[in-house]
């Protein structure tokens, strides 16, 4: 009888172990993506969903043998929120298993300093969803799949000015009309460069209110320092744009990857395997090109340390 019971326990355990992967394989993979982050991800009424991250999420879901669902959200940061808290709230509330294109820095992955956070606005949100607070977990990253640097973009008049000189660093912008968005990383870089050498050349604009690239296009400014993704998006939306890429990338950039919750090692391990396979096959680079995104492979360190210390120390 004991032998029969032992055999039964082994059989049940074996069946459960065999059933778990099959069940996981058929389970929908839900990925949260920002609805207004072209050409990484875009979701607008009346238009098909688009972007590099949409295609990459589908490729990963295919590798895992799971159907894909995108949970779109809108990031409207205020003084009580941050990208890290928004991502954590979405994951901790079970809205998705992964958040895509997450910026991998040490600060963005530390345990939250608060116990709860509000959810960002998301597709399907109810009125109570917009006010309630979610108990937070701890974030865990995947391996990176994309490197995002800051680059110098030049307006049409600056292209003429810089024709005889190569833009090899932010110091080469001296004497140009530099536009920058207040409170951004690029603002800190330019304002502190060489003990403030560029300060008199800088005009500050308000993010979300002033049109930085529009002013550059119209010739009201000569140059700016911004996320390469934004330049890609502008040029894709304005086929006749005269804004030129300088080809210069600021030496401190960040990797992007997925982020999930600590404790979901099985999913993150499977995603990392899929990312490695897709990277080796050249698929990730191909998806980026198809989306109009300048692809730069991830760089070491995978997770950037103290950004401000690196900038102020340069």
Predicted segments, located by residue:
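Extracytoplasmic small-molecule ligand-binding "clamshell" domains
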Residues: 25-110, 205
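Periplasmic-binding protein-like
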Residues: 34-36, 127-151, 228, 235-275, ...
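Ligand-binding cleft/hinge of the Venus flytrap
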Residues: 41-44, 57-73, 116-117, 156-159, ...
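Extended ligand-binding regions for polar small-molecule ligands
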Residues: 54-64, 154-164, 171, 176-177, ...
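Hydrophobic residues within well-ordered alpha-helices
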Residues: 60, 85-92, 152, 173, ...
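A ligand-binding cleft/hinge motif common to bilobed small-molecule-binding domains
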Residues: 92, 100-131, 189-193, 217-252
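A conserved helix-loop-strand patch within extracytoplasmic ligand-binding domains
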Residues: 104-108, 117-183, 187
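Ligand-binding clefts/hinges and TM-proximal coupling segments of bilobed small-molecule sensing domains
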Residues: 161, 165-168, 185-192, 242-244, ...
């Amino acid at each position: 009888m004991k032998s029969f019971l032992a055999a039964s326990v082994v059989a049940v355990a074996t069946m459960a172990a065999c059933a778990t992967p099959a069940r996981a394989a058929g389970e929908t993979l839900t990925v949260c993506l920002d609805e207004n982050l072209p050409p990484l991800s875009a979701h607008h009424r009346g238009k098909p969903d688009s972007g590099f991250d949409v295609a990459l999420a589908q490729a990963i879901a295919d590798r895992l043998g799971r159907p894909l669902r995108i949970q779109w959200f809108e990031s409207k940061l205020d003084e009580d929120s941050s990208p890290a808290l928004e991502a954590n709230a979405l994951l901790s509330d079970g809205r998705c298993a992964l958040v895509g294109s997450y910026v991998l820095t040490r600060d963005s992955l530390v345990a939250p300093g608060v116990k709860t956070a509000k959810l960002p606005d998301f597709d399907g949100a109810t009125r109570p969803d917009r006010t309630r607070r979610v108990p937070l977990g701890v974030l865990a990253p995947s391996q990176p799949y994309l490197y995002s640097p800051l680059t110098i973009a030049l307006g049409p008049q600056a292209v003429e000015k810089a024709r005889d000189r190569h833009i090899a660093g932010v110091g080469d912008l001296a004497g140009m009309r530099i536009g920058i968005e207040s409170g951004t990383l690029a603002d800190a870089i330019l304002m502190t460069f060489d003990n403030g050498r560029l300060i008199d050349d800088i005009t500050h604009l308000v993010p979300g209110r002033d049109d930085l690239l529009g002013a550059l296009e119209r010739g009201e400014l000569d140059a700016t320092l911004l996320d390469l993704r934004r330049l890609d998006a502008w040029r894709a939306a304005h086929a006749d744009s005269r804004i030129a890429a300088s080809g210069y990338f600021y030496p401190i950039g960040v990797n992007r990857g997925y982020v999930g919750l600590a404790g979901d090692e099985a999913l993150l391990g499977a995603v990392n395997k899929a990312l490695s396979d897709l990277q080796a096959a050249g698929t990730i680079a191909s998806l980026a090109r198809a989306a109009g995104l300048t692809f730069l492979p991830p760089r070491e360190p995978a997770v950037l340390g103290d950004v401000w210390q690196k900038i102020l120390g340069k």
